[in-house]
Curated annotation (Swiss-Prot):
Quaternary structure (record): Homodimer. Forms a heterodimer with PFKFB2.
Species per Swiss-Prot/TrEMBL record: Rattus norvegicus
Residues found modified as Phosphothreonine: T492
Name of the protein described by the UniProt record: 6-phosphofructo-2-kinase/fructose-2,6-bisphosphatase 3
PANTHER family given in the database record: 6-PHOSPHOFRUCTO-2-KINASE/FRUCTOSE-2,6-BISPHOSPHATASE, 6-PHOSPHOFRUCTO-2-KINASE_FRUCTOSE-2,6-BISPHOSPHATASE 3
Its job: Catalyzes both the synthesis and degradation of fructose 2,6-bisphosphate.
Catalysis: reaction(s): beta-D-fructose 2,6-bisphosphate + H2O = beta-D-fructose 6-phosphate + phosphate; beta-D-fructose 6-phosphate + ATP = beta-D-fructose 2,6-bisphosphate + ADP + H(+)
Entry EC number(s): 2.7.1.105, 3.1.3.46
Stored Gene3D superfamilies: P-loop containing nucleotide triphosphate hydrolases, Phosphoglycerate mutase-like
C-alpha cells in the first residue's frame, strides 16, 4: 500500500521589537522622484555649513540641481545689527519669535525652489537642535510631498570646535566690529545657549523612523538610519569619503604633444620637444614643493605617462582620466571637423556641455566617468593629477563650483600647474606657469552660431526655420538641459570601453562600397547595391543591408 505524504502546518512566530510598530520603508512621499529637503542638525561650529556647501557643490556637479538655504543669512537680513549672544538665549521670547519667522521664510523659499524653479534638492542649513523644530520641518515636507533627509554633525572635540570658530565664525558679519578674543568669548556663550535645549537624533526611540546620517567627530564614525532612495545613498557615500585634513591638490595637463602642435584633437601622440622640457620643469617644481607622500596619477595615454616618467616617482594610471572620446572626430583638426562634419561642428558650438561626439562622449558623460576620481581625491592628502584639457576642466569645475555652462570654457593652459588648497567654504587656486612655451589649445565661446548654413549642407529640408543662435539663448538652453536638436546616440555607452581606432565612413556610398567589396560572392542577384539614378541612402540602405544579412545569416 503506497504511503501518503503529509505536510506539517507552518507556524508563524512573531518577535516584536517594541510595542510601537515600525513604519514601512515606503512611507512618505508617494512619488519615487520627489524633491528632497536635506535638514542640517547640530550645535554651532560643528561644520554644518561646510557640509552644506560641499555637498551642494558635489550634487550640482553631477547634475542634480541643489541650493543651500542658510537661516543665519535670513536672520541677519531681519536683524540688521547683531548685539550679543543674548539674542540666542532660550528665555528671549522676542528673539525666539524672530528666529522662527526666519526659519519659516527660508522654508517658503525652499518650497518655491523645489516646485517652481526646477530644483531637486534644497539644503536647509540651520541648527535645528530641538524635536519641535524638526517636527515642523517634517510637517512642511509631508504637506508638500517632499522627502526629508537629516544630516547631524556631532563633535565633542574642543580643539576642532575652537579651530572652526577661529577659521570661520569670527570673520562672519556678526563680529565685524569685534576683536578675535571678544568674538570667541561671545560665540562660546552662544553655543552654551543652544546646548541647554539640544536634543540629538535618537535612532533607537524618538527618531527611529527618520532618514538620517549622523557624522561623528568629523567623519571618524557614521550612523546611518533608513536611507530612502538612490540620491540619499549617494549623499551618504559622499559624506563618508570627505575629510578636513590639510592637504594640497596639484592639477596639470601633460606636456605639449605632437597633436597639440598640429591642432588635432584626441589621439594618443607623444610629447613634443617643448613638452619634454615641461616634464623636466615639472620634476624640479615637485622637488621644490618638498611634499610628503605625494601621490601621482596619470591617464593611460602616452603624453601623461611620458610627463610622469620625468618625475622619477611612482605613479598610477587611471583609465577614467583619459581625454574625452571624440568618436569619429578623433585625430582631426577643428577645421577638418567643420568641413567634414558641419552639422556636428554646429551642434557642438551650440551646446558644448551636452553635445556628444558620434560614437564618442560629451562633457556630461565625462563628469559621470570622473566621479570615482573625485571620490578618491576627497579621500587623499597630497596628490598630483596629470591629465588632459577636458578632464582638467571637469575636475576644476568641481573644486571651484563652476556650472555646466562654464565648465567647457574654463582656461586650462599647457605647461601650467594649478595648486588647489581647500579653505573654509571652498578652494583657493594658484596658477603656476613653469616658463616653458607651448601652443594654446583654448577655444573661446562663439558669439553666434549660424546653424542654418551648416545644417543645410547635410539636411537642407530639416532646418529651414532655424536662424542664428545667440549666446543668451544658448545660456537658457544650457539651464534647461540637453537641446532638443541634440542627437543623443542612445546606442553608444556613456564611456567608450577603449580608445580604439574607429574606421571613419564619410558617406553611405562609401559604406556600401566597402560592404560590397567585403562580400563579393554573397550578394543575391535580386538585390541592387545602388538604387537607379541616386546613391543608396537612409531606409533604402538599411533595408538592403538587412536583406543581405537575413539571406546569408546562419541563424
Amino acid at each position: 500500500m503506497p504511503l501518503e505524504l503529509t505536510q506539517s502546518r507552518v507556524q508563524k512566530i512573531w518577535v516584536p521589537v517594541d510595542h510601537r510598530p515600525s513604519l514601512p520603508r515606503s512611507c512618505g512621499p508617494k512619488l519615487t522622484n520627489s524633491p528632497t529637503v536635506i535638514v542640517m542638525v547640530g550645535l554651532p561650529a560643528r561644520g554644518k555649513t561646510y557640509i552644506s556647501k560641499k555637498l551642494t557643490r558635489y550634487l550640482n556637479w553631477i547634475g542634480v540641481p541643489t541650493k543651500v538655504f542658510n537661516v543665519g543669512e535670513y536672520r541677519r537680513e531681519a536683524v540688521k545689527q547683531y548685539s550679543s549672544y543674548n539674542f540666542f538665549r532660550p528665555d528671549n521670547e522676542e528673539a525666539m519669535r524672530v528666529r522662527k519667522q526666519c526659519a519659516l521664510a527660508a522654508l517658503r523659499d525652499v518650497k518655491s525652489y523645489l516646485t517652481k524653479e526646477g530644483g531637486q534638492i534644497a539644503v536647509f542649513d540651520a541648527t535645528n537642535t530641538t524635536r519641535e523644530r524638526r517636527h515642523m520641518i517634517l510637517h512642511f515636507a509631508k504637506e508638500n510631498d517632499f522627502k526629508a533627509f537629516f544630516i547631524e554633525s556631532v563633535c565633542d572635540d574642543p580643539t576642532v570646535v575652537a579651530s572652526n570658530i577661529m577659521e570661520v565664525k569670527i570673520s562672519s558679519p556678526d563680529y565685524k566690529d569685534c576683536n578675535s578674543a571678544e568674538a570667541m568669548d561671545d560665540f562660546m556663550k552662544r553655543i552654551n545657549c543652544y546646548e541647554a535645549s539640544y536634543q540629538p537624533l535618537d535612532p533607537d526611540k524618538c527618531d527611529r523612523d527618520l532618514s538620517f546620517i549622523k557624522v561623528i567627530d568629523v567623519g571618524r564614525r557614521f550612523l546611518v538610519n533608513r536611507v530612502q532612495d538612490h540620491i540619499q545613498s549617494r549623499i551618504v557615500y559622499y559624506l563618508m569619503n570627505i575629510h578636513v585634513q590639510p592637504r594640497t591638490i596639484y592639477l596639470c595637463r601633460h606636456g605639449e604633444n605632437e597633436y597639440n602642435v598640429q591642432g588635432k584633437i584626441g589621439g594618443d601622440s607623444g610629447l613634443s620637444s617643448r613638452g619634454k622640457k615641461f616634464a623636466n620643469a615639472l620634476s624640479k617644481f615637485v622637488e621644490e614643493q618638498n611634499l610628503k607622500d605625494l601621490r601621482v596619477w596619470t591617464s593611460q595615454l602616452k603624453s601623461t605617462i611620458q610627463t610622469a616618467e620625468a618625475l622619477r616617482l611612482p605613479y598610477e594610471q587611471w583609465k577614467a582620466l583619459n581625454e574625452i572620446d571624440a568618436g569619429v572626430c578623433e585625430e582631426l583638426t577643428y577645421e577638418e571637423i567643420r568641413d567634414t562634419y558641419p552639422e556636428e561642428y554646429a551642434l557642438r558650438e551650440q551646446d558644448k556641455y551636452y553635445y556628444r561626439y558620434p560614437t564618442g562622449e560629451s562633457y556630461q558623460d565625462l563628469v559621470q566617468r570622473l566621479e570615482p576620481v573625485i571620490m578618491e581625491l576627497e579621500r587623499q592628502e597630497n596628490v598630483l593629477v596629470i591629465c588632459h584639457q577636458a578632464v582638467l576642466r571637469c575636475l576644476l569645475a568641481y573644486f571651484l563650483d563652476k556650472s555646466a555652462e562654464e565648465m567647457p570654457y574654463l582656461k586650462c593652459p599647457l605647461h601650467t600647474v594649478l595648486k588647489l588648497t581647500p579653505v573654509a567654504y571652498g578652494c583657493r587656486v594658484e596658477s603656476i606657469y613653469l616658463n616653458v612655451e607651448s601652443v594654446s589649445t583654448h577655444r573661446e565661446r562663439s558669439e553666434a552660431v549660424k546653424i542654418q548654413h551648416f545644417a543645410s549642407v547635410v539636411r537642407p529640408s530639416s532646418y529651414t526655420e532655424l536662424d542664428f543662435l545667440s549666446v543668451e539663448s544658448a545660456k537658457q538652453d544650457a539651464k534647461k538641459g540637453p537641446n532638443p536638436l541634440m542627437r543623443r546616440n542612445s546606442v553608444t555607452p556613456l564611456a567608450s570601453p577603449e580608445p580604439t581606432k574607429k574606421p571613419r565612413i564619410n558617406s553611405f556610398e562609401e559604406h556600401v562600397a566597402s560592404t560590397s567589396a567585403a562580400l563579393p560572392s554573397c550578394l543575391p542577384p535580386e538585390v541592387p547595391t545602388q538604387l537607379p539614378g541616386q546613391p543608396l541612402l537612409g531606409k533604402a540602405c538599411l533595408r538592403t543591408v538587412c536583406h543581405i544579412f537575413s539571406k546569408f545569416s546562419p541563424y
